[in-house]
Design a protein with these regions (language model features):
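ATP-dependent carboxylate-amine ligase catalytic core
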Residues: 1
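C-terminal accessory "lid"/substrate-recognition subdomains
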Residues: 51, 74-100, 116-151
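C-terminal boundary of histidine-terminating zinc-finger modules
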Residues: 106-119
Length: 151
């Protein structure tokens, strides 16, 4: 389930209604976005909510122009999510670049994740990391239960 950044009623409602296997927090590398990611991670880790954080994904990690596919421009900062993952002892599941082909492919019904490109590879690596993280969570932890609210 894709949720808005931070912590809000929608996050609480979700964990009250659905036994969530785990949370994957997505952020861009700049400080203001990382602050929201920290709040989200902290919320899921509270004793009352107790939803395992499976990992962190850095979106828009760098910009790569189509005409210079090997160039990386860190327009939102560099390695913000990697540093946060290390600090909070969670897995960095992947880094997704900001490239025009993502938008174009989506608009044309051609997902870049299926292409043999740097971006396609990033999405494939992310998918493998997510599967491994879920497998690890399921081996090491009991199933998550819905959050019970007492009145």
């Amino acid at each position: 389930v894709d949720l808005p950044p931070g912590t809000s009623d929608i996050h609480l409602t979700l964990v009250q209604e659905v036994p969530v296997t785990g949370a994957i927090v997505v952020s861009t590398p700049q400080e203001v976005a990382l602050a929201d990611a920290i709040k989200g991670i902290a919320m899921f880790r509270t004793e009352k909510i107790n939803v395992p954080v499976l990992g962190l994904v850095e979106n828009m990690s760098w910009f790569t122009p189509a005409e210079l596919p090997s160039n990386k421009y860190y327009i939102f900062g560099k390695e913000g999510c990697r540093k946060l993952a290390e600090k909070m002892d969670i897995t960095l599941l992947g880094q997704i670049p900001l490239v025009q082909s993502i938008c174009e492919g989506s608009d044309n019904g051609e997902p870049v994740a299926l292409n043999d490109t740097v971006t396609g590879s990033a999405f494939n690596e992310l998918a493998v990391s997510v599967v491994k993280s879920i497998e690890k969570r399921n081996r090491e932890q009991r199933p998550t239960i819905k959050l019970e609210i007492s009145k």
